Amino acid sequence: MKFVLLFGVLLVTLFSYSSAEMLDDFDQADEDELLSLIEKEEARKDCIPKHHECTSNKHGCCRGHSFKYKCQCTTVVTQSGEETERCFCGTPPHHEAAELVVGFGKKIFG
């Protein structure tokens, strides 16, 4: 009987120790994931949304649903006759086509 009691206490001690370490690992993973999400959110706040001007920062466009927006530039003639370059963040046509095909595929195949 003493052997069974001693074995039971040892088993409970080992189980509680291992579960405590697992919980610590999960807590650390949760903290790391939270910090990663916060960093991504900060980067998102600094990016340029779709249809906004990106002339001064051509690589700062935000991400869309599937792809990152690209800075698309055009040459504009002002009223004084000067040609200036104006850029905006948008989805390139080949990305729009890919999103259309993926959306159509999701509707068909569920």
From Swiss-Prot:
Gene Ontology MF terms: toxin activity
Keywords tagged on the record: Disulfide bond, Knottin, Secreted, Signal, Toxin
Pfam families with a match to the protein in the record: Toxin_35
Primary location class: secreted
Disulfide bonds: C47-C62, C54-C71, C61-C89, C73-C87
Residue numbers covered by the propeptide annotation in the UniProt entry: 21-44
Superkingdom to which the source organism belongs: Eukaryota
Listed GO CC annotations: extracellular region
Cell compartments where the protein resides: Secreted
Keyword ATP-binding: no
Expressing tissues: Expressed by the venom gland.
Leader sequence segment: 1-20
Notes concerning its domains: The presence of a 'disulfide through disulfide knot' structurally defines this protein as a knottin.
Family classification: Belongs to the neurotoxin 19 (CSTX) family. 03 subfamily.
Protein name in UniProt: U1-lycotoxin-Ls1mm
Organism expressing this protein natively: Lycosa singoriensis (Wolf spider)
Source species taxonomy: Eukaryota, Metazoa, Ecdysozoa, Arthropoda, Chelicerata
